[in-house]
Amino acid sequence: MEDAKNIKKGPAPFYPLEDGTAGEQLHKAMKRYALVPGTIAFTDAHIEVNITYAEYFEMSVRLAEAMKRYGLNTNHRIVVCSENSLQFFMPVLGALFIGVAVAPANDIYNERELLNSMNISQPTVVFVSKKGLQKILNVQKKLPIIQKIIIMDSKTDYQGFQSMYTFVTSHLPPGFNEYDFVPESFDRDKTIALIMNSSGSTGLPKGVALPHRTACVRFSHARDPIFGNQIIPDTAILSVVPFHHGFGMFTTLGYLICGFRVVLMYRFEEELFLRSLQDYKIQSALLVPTLFSFFAKSTLIDKYDLSNLHEIASGGAPLSKEVGEAVAKRFHLPGIRQGYGLTETTSAILITPEGDDKPGAVGKVVPFFEAKVVDLDTGKTLGVNQRGELCVRGPMIMSGYVNNPEATNALIDKDGWLHSGDIAYWDEDEHFFIVDRLKSLIKYKGYQVAPAELESILLQHPNIFDAGVAGLPDDDAGELPAAVVVLEHGKTMTEKEIVDYVASQVTTAKKLRGGVVFVDEVPKGLTGKLDARKIREILIKAKKGGKSKL
């Protein structure tokens, strides 16, 4: 029996859930903003070029009509493979308007990774930037379902392939009026909007099928002044988060629903980032945790006028309490706004409410959702400050992994609870805290050791720039906690000094008995999430090379 009082439910939504598909809602919102002359949708910070809502709306509608006339419908899928750019969301919106599923592809994937991703999504059309064309051509040779390749970042045809603009011109009738276009209506619970790549942290990435309903719920959260954004004209957001990732995709679609200006970066540059905060009077900045350690120690921040900055939001991977507090202090902010979600939950389902941040917490349960923490062994629902696996339930949860019912059933139980694989607890104020990944826990002589705790301790040392912890296989103990460490430039430490430093702050089971390996870079995914598998591989290789246990 579940204890109802230990199931935490989100509050009533600030706005009711709107009718219609994600495409219909985006079309309605963007058409409204397009009719306000000069309203800017996107700015590319690198080249200082703007594009208005009118221009964006018109091109997205033209693409929708052209794709429809080409023969695409709710039975088809497209891939968008590009770095962050002014054009990225044009085919995304066009497809959503007519019910074609969009499968964003990581533009830095190699051919093998792209082939795996597209084998799952089975796209008919691929939209790609010029620099990714050759990889897509090589994939097409092995995946003949790809009928057409369209170049996103060229006004004219490129190497014999149509650009988006010539594709549109060749398929639209004379006199086509974008403002007369009506998006398609269909069942938003059954029609897939997006197929996102799962993190792949436990194997090859899987295709996460997200119906239109999930995006519609996300839009409700985006409009919410407590869990989302206050809809204030001329709000400017700075984002360096990859658009192909769920974090970047659904935050940006939410910004378009709200009519915000999105200042994008496709590559992080510290001075450009800070100058953009100042020059564009940015109110909210979106970062992945990889960049927080950098800003915690930056000496450049005070050179810029950041008086308009209201918040910095973090997502995509865990952010330690200490690093978050340090960055908030450097930017003169009361705290860092965090969110927690999985690709399989569409977007964040735990969010720091406006004005209610708590250091180290990832937020409270959002509207339409409920969450619980269960005992790892018995599955019993736990109470306040008790650690177990976080489970969530609500209407943004995926419909399933594409063509993989076994993996779907392993993640979502018969009652609709998604088992996150994250160790968490909630406090007396119903703030949730993520402790570690269930599969990342190190099993030392029967004790469970959380790598995140040791990583946080390591990052507090002034000589350590970055660190990752994993379990080193051991015949006697099961696993030994071990670390990879990047030292601050110009600083020196011995392995023993680091081991002794950690030992002085932890119980005996948590000591770094597997030792320390010095590296130039800690392996991480694109959003800053530590790659435990690669860290473990480095540690095992170092041990085979003669490294002794401590």
Swiss-Prot record:
Q: Where is this motif: Microbody targeting signal?
A: 548-550
Give the UniProt record's GO annotations in the biological process aspect. bioluminescence
EC code: 1.13.12.7
Q: Which CDD domains does this UniProt record tie to the protein?
A: Firefly_Luc (cd17642)
- Keyword entries, A-Z: ATP-binding, Luminescence, Magnesium, Metal-binding, Monooxygenase, Nucleotide-binding, Oxidoreductase, Peroxisome, Photoprotein
| Reaction catalysed by this enzyme | firefly D-luciferin + ATP + O2 = firefly oxyluciferin + hnu + AMP + CO2 + diphosphate
> Where does it live in the cell?
Peroxisome
Note whether Membrane occurs among the keywords: no
What is the protein's given name?
Answer: Luciferin 4-monooxygenase
Q: What does this protein do?
A: Produces green light with a wavelength of 562 nm.
What cofactor is this protein dependent on? Answer: Mg(2+)
Record-linked InterPro entries: AMP-bd_C (IPR025110), AMP-bd_C_sf (IPR045851), AMP-binding_CS (IPR020845), AMP-dep_synth/lig_dom (IPR000873)
One family name in Pfam for this protein: AMP-binding_C
What is stated as this protein's family in its record? Belongs to the ATP-dependent AMP-binding enzyme family.
- Give the GO cellular component terms, alphabetically: peroxisome
GO MF terms, alphabetically ordered: ATP binding; CoA-ligase activity; metal ion binding; Photinus-luciferin 4-monooxygenase (ATP-hydrolyzing) activity; protein-folding chaperone binding
